Amino acid sequence: MPQSWEELAADKRARLAKTIPDEWKVQTLPAEDSVIDFPKKSGILSEAELKITEASAADLVSKLAAGELTSVEVTLAFCKRAAIAQQLTNCAHEFFPDAALAQARELDEYYAKHKRPVGPLHGLPISLKDQLRVKGYETSMGYISWLNKYDEGDSVLTTMLRKAGAVFYVKTSVPQTLMVCETVNNIIGRTVNPRNKNWSCGGSSGGEGAIVGIRGGVIGVGTDIGGSIRVPAAFNFLYGLRPSHGRLPYAKMANSMEGQETVHSVVGPITHSVEDLRLFTKSVLGQEPWKYDSKVIPMPWRQSESDIIASKIKNGGLNIGYYNFDGNVLPHPPILRGVETTVAALAKAGHTVTPWTPYKHDFGHDLISHIYAADGSADVMRDISASGEPAIPNIKDLLNPNIKAVNMNELWDTHLQKWNYQMEYLEKWREAEEKAGKELDAIIAPITPTAAVRHDQFRYYGYASVINLLDFTSVVVPVTFADKNIDKKNESFKAVSELDALVQEEYDPEAYHGAPVAVQVIGRRLSEERTLAIAEEVGKLLGNVVTP
């Protein structure tokens, strides 16, 4: 007899719970809203394991390569902390510590025999968003109808990371459909922010944001079609890289709307530092992914591009544009302060900072919103209805059910509109450079209109999604935290739209006190090396080279 969707979900939750050994179970869950420091006082991790999980990925791979740490030691530490993270934040879809430790033992045996690492990530545990396929495990994408189907092979990126020496131990939670910036589905429920359980961890790579935020992971792999790497990074006070399409391999990953080629989802890392973002990116590019994924551009890591930024920083400074309002939705006071703080730090260090006028972001936001629903939402609704489960309420914030499926001629016209908009934006970029008499190195902007938002209150995607439409490289840099004593409600606010009013009405200085605040550093398309270097400079000036 077919099982109901509720029974299928309950079975999955029961199977997931059994993957946590009894000795790693939290006996009494903390009552406090913030659980960010709970792993340190849980008694589950030893002092040595705490030290490992508090270290950077760059430091860990250095010690693993030198034989100062074994992969089993490092993997066990992160498995234990990930188990705690799962119990506190509900951040996992799959957890497989036994397989991870077996993989770690194989790597240790290789090192003992050959006296060298297998690759740049030798022995390092890396957490994977549920989209990445790992042979033998489920990829549900937050759909109940996808449960009980086991992957017969790895995604290309999974293969690349495995070749580089990474260890896999967890696949993290995503929202139903992937198409929202809140992580909730009918299988496991809601994933929460470890800094405050009343705040969203972001989405769709929300499980990655939560697990890396609480240091149950050191490098997390996410994806981004409308902010899904950058928003979880921002909400968890982390760094996140949204590379341009074609830089890192996406082949053989699961996705909603597969075959949609107008705006591409991209894959990238979430970490505690730019150094670790760079480690991940260089390690993957070192595996020559263009030989495995036909959409990847044959472009190895270009150190010369990083060096150009280093030279500019040393000799006269960078030329940075900035904006704090896209003309559609005004950010909350903490975000406005975050942009102001970043701009002031850059100016104080001698960099040139100039206001940037966002170009037709209302058009860009409207266009990409129509692209998301170009099939009339048929793809996602098919996978939702297949099990009889209801759609999560958040879907209506991004996928408009009133938009009808487009025909081929309308699709071609959409492609042309996107291309024209991209070229118009490049023209504005060039005009700014001609006016300044030098390159515009990057633009500083909000990534969301809110600090880490309260559950089910994420309304506006435009600060993130327009960058997807333009396919610019973007790096999220954590700035500060909301402060009720500084970030007072804007009493003179006048809305430019109903959505603008709705977002601003959500702001409560008390409720948002302590919420992470971030900005994004936006570079030209395929400018990963330069944009990472600029983000590193920004993080250094803000005192956030490595986040806690």
From Swiss-Prot:
Q: Name one GO biological process term.
A: amide catabolic process
Catalytic reactions on record: a monocarboxylic acid amide + H2O = a monocarboxylate + NH4(+); acetamide + H2O = acetate + NH4(+)
Q: Name one GO molecular function term.
A: amidase activity
Catalytic site = 129 (charge relay system), 204 (charge relay system), 228 (acyl-ester intermediate)
Pfam families this protein is in? Amidase
What keywords are assigned to this protein?
Hydrolase
Asked if the keyword Cell wall biogenesis/degradation belongs to this entry, the reply reads no
Asked if the keyword Hydrolase belongs to this entry, the reply reads yes
Enzyme class name: hydrolase
EC number assigned by the record: 3.5.1.4
Q: Which PANTHER family match?
A: ACETAMIDASE (PTHR46072:SF9), AMIDASE-RELATED-RELATED (PTHR46072)
Which protein family is it in?
Answer: Belongs to the amidase family.
Function, as annotated, reads:
Allows acetamide to be used as a sole carbon or nitrogen source.
Q: What is this protein called?
A: Acetamidase
| Species of the source | Emericella nidulans (strain FGSC A4 / ATCC 38163 / CBS 112.46 / NRRL 194 / M139)
Which gene is this protein's source? amdS
